[in-house]
A protein has these predicted regions:
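Conserved active-site-adjacent core of cysteine acyl-enzyme catalytic domains
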Residues: 1-126
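A contiguous loop/helix-start segment that scaffolds small-molecule binding in enzyme catalytic cores
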Residues: 129
Length: 136
């Protein structure tokens, strides 16, 4: 098992808030706390949501080193928690926090649904191969 951790669930109130809620969950995981509204402002969230770059830049304001990477395999993720960028079947993009990965399951904190366990193959069908990594 990789990355046995416990993530704090931060539920989104708005469709556009998945990215900032995922970032707030990362911040709280490392014992920080920033008001969601401040993260929205710092990440330049619009009615379309938040870009990966703006999530990275906002996290740097809170003391994180962060980077976005495009990976060939979900198993290439070595730093947990990580934010995954998703392309949902309904045509929306979405962000979730990966807590851990096993051989056939992925444990995530989904700002829209809470704690979710997915089959790796199902996750891969919606994953854009992009993850955001954070180092406190």
């Amino acid at each position: 098992m990789k990355g046995e951790i416990y993530m704090i669930v931060v539920r989104q109130r708005d469709e556009k808030d998945c990215g900032v809620c995922a970032l707030l969950s990362i911040i709280r995981h490392y014992k920080g706390n920033v008001p969601l509204e401040k993260i929205r402002l710092d990440a330049k969230t619009t009615n379309e949501g938040t870009t990966a770059l703006n999530l990275i830049l906002a996290s740097q304001k809170y003391g994180f080193e962060a980077m976005g990477v495009k990976l060939n395999s979900i198993y290439d993720i070595k730093q947990f928690p990580a934010i995954a960028h998703m392309n949902l079947k309904k045509g929306y993009t979405h962000y979730v926090v990966i807590e851990k990965i096993t051989k056939d399951k992925i444990f995530i904190m989904d700002p829209a649904k809470g704690k979710v366990v997915m089959k790796v193959n199902d996750f891969i069908c919606e994953w854009s191969n992009v993850v955001l990594l954070f180092y406190p």
